[in-house]
Amino acid sequence: MKIDSGIVGRESAPERVEVDKRWIMAYNAALGAVSATPHPLYPVCYEWNATRALRQATGLQNLNAQLVHAQHDLNVHRAPQAGETLTTLARVVAAEQRRPGAFVTIRLAARGAGGDAVSTTDYGMLYRAVHLEGGNRSLEKLEDPPRHAGELSKVGEVPVAATAAHVYTECARIWNPIHTDPEYARDAGLPGIILHGTATLAFSISTLMGALRPKTLRRVQCRFSGMVLMPSTLTVHASRQGDAIAFETRDERGEPVIERGWIG
């Protein structure tokens, strides 16, 4: 299996999505909250159509079984509002060969009706055991999440129900069968269905907000470093470092499933 680095620079057609109150509340409900305020990670919901359209346009959709969400870097310019229509443009901004496979980064830029920036996400995807042809390419300077400078303390736990991935799929309107279909997941080489990386991240952010109550949240960065099987209990560990909060989320064995996490 292979990916041609010539896909760098390819864009999707602009995807228009209406943000509605029901969707906002459903996403919060998937995370165990009753609220009509958009969750900081809600952008993953309205970005999904653009992500899928770009994968289809570039042929990456044919490699979905090899895809692992590996890295996330979200900048929130302003909160989305219920009732508005957002336009999201997806663009492949980098491709590089890594030891486990081909690493592809797409940039998702969402704007309001007046053209104002709402959110920008660099979404890193690892295609396991896939070879990159044409050499590494990059159109943008991309930032890896920095390493943590100090010790992290446990700030909370996240109980993950056996049904968490199914509920998150429907409430977020994000569907990939590795999260809901055991047979598909096993055929993809996984031990079973796994929780979405964005769900793990959203649960972690909710825990951090409840425990440490940051005054602002304009940026989220992390690496996804392990699979979350269900049911399970995750622990979130964090500390304030400068103006940001550093965090790591660990599984029941104490192994990180999110590392180099930052919110600020």
Listing of model-derived features with the role each one plays in the protein:
Residues M1-R10, H69-E157, M230-P231, T235-G264:
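HotDog/MaoC-like acyl-thioester-processing domains
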